[in-house]
Design a protein with these regions (language model features):
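Long, low-complexity, Lys/Arg-enriched
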Residues: 1-57, 69-104
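Elongated alpha-helical scaffolds
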Residues: 62-69
Length: 104
């Protein structure tokens, strides 16, 4: 089995080191021109997530609009999204299955 990827929106000022126990961190850096343009944001994230797999994870952080678009893309492609949520000084994995019939 290949190592899972952990997608992170932006680099922020957070310490993501605990998330490394779940897989390789992949930073999705959004250019300033796409930051507030949802259509461009969608295209940037589609490109950044091109190598995503159904078992990869997404850290919930950054702007809410960016998290929403990233979640929508992953659900569209895989029927689910695997979140990493920071709670009690560590990351926890949470899976949201919306359409179990989608196969990747």
């Amino acid at each position: 089995m290949t190592e899972r990827k952990v997608y992170v929106l932006g680099r922020g000022g957070h310490d993501y080191s605990d998330a490394e126990r779940f897989g390789k961190l992949v930073f999705l850096d959004i250019p300033n021109y796409a930051r507030w343009d949802i259509d461009r944001l969608y295209r940037e994230l589609e490109e950044g997530l091109a190598d995503a797999d159904k078992d990869d994870l997404f850290i919930v952080s950054h702007l809410a609009s960016h998290c929403c678009v990233c979640t929508a893309i992953l659900i569209e492609w895989f029927g689910r999204v695997n979140f990493l949520i920071y709670r009690k000084d560590k990351y926890e994995e949470h899976k949201l299955v919306v359409n179990p019939d989608v196969e990747a």
